[in-house]
Amino acid sequence: MRDIEVRCHGGISIISAFAQRFGASVSIGLEMGVRFSGAVQFPGGSIETEKTLGFLLKKYPGSTIPGITIESDIPQGQGLKSSSAFTLALVVGFTAINGMNISELETLRLAAEASIANGTSITGAFDDLCSSYYGGVCLTDNASMDLLKRYDSPTGLVLIAYNPEKYRITGSMDISTLRKYSESFTPLKDLVMNGYPLAASLINGHLIGEITGMNTDVIGYFREKGASYVSQSGKGPAVFAVFHRKRDLDDAVRYFPTGTGFRCISTGFTNEGIRVSDK
């Protein structure tokens, strides 16, 4: 049996689909690599890994269970799409190692089902899966699991601020409050369709942040340092800032307040999609 590696990216929320059926996200340079090797009785790993493989084995009885090794640059539980990248990589690797021939759309819908089954998503996060699979900006109908539009990422340098001691797990969120404000999210779809993903992302983050809470001190700091767009990434709690001048980003990192528990990661948007290679 061949060994393979699957590599894909995290992302930033543009429209969170908790409140209504449409979702959108944009891929960023933070990457996850998952290596699949040989056949094992039990691969070990996290409960999410167990649940994902259990879901896939129920779907495809008699399939080979591969050994799995995960390396990731994507902070977990921060709204940066680490769970979607993880689930997508597992589904793509599992189907590849078992020689299954399924279409891109079938793969993405299977990953959305797996995301619900493993408890990392409430809606299936079809938008996040699409941006990780294709790169760039993806707008989706998460109810019908259809890709409505995909286009290249906006320009700009991205700075992420997050506190590793504070995180939010999507599967444990109460989204009933968000759904009460579904009409507030309705205009965001048109913004994305018309090529304004960062404007939509800014509004989306602030709408959700009003309910979940957000770090206004960090947001205000990045604004002072010249960021063009600053918001919480979806449910957060990570904050992202987009700069158009490198010296502004460098200053934001250099003078970031100490003793806050926050870490900063410099990255960028990416149009690179998922890659599968033999190892």
For every predicted segment, state its role.
Residues 1-78, 268-272, 276-279:
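ATP-binding N-lobe of GHMP and related small-molecule kinases
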Residues 38, 164, 241-245:
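Short beta-strand-to-loop capping motifs
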Residues 54, 58, 89-97, 190, ...:
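Short glycine/serine- and small hydrophobic-enriched flexible loop segments
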Residues 62-67, 94-110, 247, 251-256:
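Phosphate-handling active-site elements
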Residues 80-106, 133-135:
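DPxDG-like acidic metal-binding loop motif
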Residues 105-149, 219:
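Alpha/beta catalytic cores of group-transfer enzymes, especially the acyltransferase/condensing modules
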Residues 153-214, 220:
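Acyltransferase
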Residues 193-279:
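Glycine-rich, charge-dense phosphate/pyrophosphate-binding loop(s)
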